[in-house]
């Protein structure tokens, strides 16, 4: 994690907090950028480039097999750097939450593969993984918000004048 000024966040006994890997909290970033794009479109060129870059990365990892945690260099983390989901076993999954947020990034993109990410979200199932782990809260809500984004129904609600 970083501080708001971009410096590395240091915690207990001068140790860096976490590994800096892309994982659960990071999943929200593509959808947050899609939200900003939908509501304000303040930096369209950068947002489009970001959307296509992140979708290209996950597509290159296998659209049906990409995992839910990566090192910042794009490699798979070593076992000691994998964060267990919800106290469950330390495994990498093809998580519905990440499928959802990467699909929401399709709002930013003009390339052909965006439709494939939307199709994967549409056909995703909110059910336990093969190992029995199930997170209706995080995976389920990211899935719901992605559907809202892509349907055009995630809007700013303003008071009636």
Question: Would you name each region that the model predicts?
Answer:
Residues 32-35, 39, 105-161:
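Terminal, non-catalytic domain-edge segments
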Residues 1-115, 137:
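Extended ligand-binding clefts on enzyme/binding-domain cores
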């Amino acid at each position: 994690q970083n501080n708001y000024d971009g410096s590395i966040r240091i915690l207990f006994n001068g140790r860096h907090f976490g590994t800096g890997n892309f994982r659960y909290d990071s999943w929200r970033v593509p959808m947050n950028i899609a939200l900003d794009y939908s509501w304000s479109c303040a930096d369209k060129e950068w947002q489009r480039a970001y959307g296509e870059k992140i979708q290209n990365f996950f597509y290159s990892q296998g659209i049906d097999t990409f995992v839910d945690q990566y090192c910042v260099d794009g490699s798979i983390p070593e076992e000691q750097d994998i964060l267990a989901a919800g106290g469950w076993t330390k495994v990498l999954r093809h998580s519905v939450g990440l499928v959802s947020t990467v699909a929401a990034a399709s709002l930013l993109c003009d390339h052909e593969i965006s439709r494939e990410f939307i199709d994967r979200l549409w056909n995703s199932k909110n059910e336990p993984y093969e190992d029995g782990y199930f997170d209706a809260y995080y995976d389920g809500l990211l899935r719901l918000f992605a559907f809202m984004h892509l349907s055009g129904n995630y809007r700013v609600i303003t008071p009636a004048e």
